[in-house]
UniProtKB/Swiss-Prot annotation:
Residues 17-29, 227-238, 249-259 have a biased composition (Low complexity). The gene is MRPL4. Residues 260-272 have a biased composition (Polar residues). Component of the mitochondrial large ribosomal subunit. Mature mitochondrial ribosomes consist of a small (37S) and a large (54S) subunit. The 37S subunit contains at least 33 different proteins and 1 molecule of RNA (15S). The 54S subunit contains at least 45 different proteins and 1 molecule of RNA (21S). GO terms for cellular component: mitochondrial large ribosomal subunit. This is Large ribosomal subunit protein uL29m. Belongs to the universal ribosomal protein uL29 family. It is found in: Mitochondrion.
Length: 272
């Protein structure tokens, strides 16, 4: 207890050591640091540029929605009040508007599953090979229109949370997509056939692909015309000969008047 009472505290030792100068440490004089604006102001050179921004709207941001830097008063302008839905005027729409074609039924948002399932099978490539270009063009846009109707019905069903008709719509969409796939297949076949025909025409001397004259000039055209003329002359000669042969018996059957004897000569002639 006596030793502890005579031992100085750590705080007292610190004060003693700071108050008594150490013989090993040199004596230096330090100036007091001030945090006032006058002492902390940076030195300004004559050639230094002024980077001060004089914009009155500095700090306002439309992205961060910081708003204006001062309050604005709009008490002098009356603010608009929302109108209840039941008091809004009725909007007149065109009954024959083209956007109605996106709905299968104008009275119902989505048809029932039995009505959605009423559709035929898809067209096959064999059936479409016999169709013209115009028919394939019309059928393609009919399929595109049907797919737009299906997409509109699916969006309305998901928005309303009806929960029915998804499987039927998927089957209907698959049938339409299969038809469009067959149309593409047929058009690809026709394109390949056209390419092969162009390659053959480039080597054919009777075909001219320059576009400066007739596209097809057969080499045996003159031969056919000469043969037809020769056949026509032969037929005309044969017809003339037949007419002459038919005229000869008629000429022999009618005797001339000079060769017929008179009645007196016939009586004078003695009978044997």
């Amino acid at each position: 207890m006596a030793a502890a009472a005579m031992r100085p505290s750590m705080g007292a030792l610190g004060r003693i050591s700071s108050s008594t100068p150490s013989p090993l440490r040199p004596l230096t004089q330090t100036a007091s640091l001030s945090t006032t604006a006058a002492l902390l102001k940076r030195h300004k050179y004559r050639e230094a540029r002024v980077y001060r921004d004089n914009s009155k709207h500095r700090g306002e941001s439309a992205i961060h929605r910081s708003g204006t830097r001062w309050r604005l008063s709009m008490s002098d302008e009356p603010l608009p009040r929302p109108v209840p839905r039941n008091k809004l005027p009725a909007i007149e729409t065109d009954p024959d508007h083209g956007l109605w074609e996106f709905f299968q039924n104008r009275t119902m948002v989505v048809n029932s599953p039995p009505e959605i399932a009423k559709h035929g099978r898809s067209w096959t490539a064999e059936e479409l090979r016999h169709k013209s270009w115009d028919d394939l063009h019309r059928l393609w846009w009919v399929c595109a229109k049907e797919r737009n109707r299906i997409a509109t019905a699916n969006w309305e069903r998901n928005k309303s949370g009806l929960g029915f008709g998804e499987a039927e719509m998927r089957e209907r969409d698959n049938a339409v997509r299969q038809t469009m796939r067959s149309i593409k297949h047929v058009l690809t076949e026709r394109f390949y056939t056209w390419e092969d025909a162009v390659k053959v025409a480039e080597k054919d001397p009777e075909v001219d692909l320059t576009g400066n004259g007739p596209a097809f000039t057969p080499s045996n055209f003159l031969e056919d015309s000469d043969a037809a003329a020769t056949e026509g002359e032969q037929q005309a000669a044969e017809a003339t000969e037949e007419a002459v042969e038919k005229a000869e018996p008629a000429t022999a059957a009618t005797p001339e008047s000079a060769t017929i004897p008179s009645s007196q000569q016939q009586t004078d002639t003695p009978r044997l």
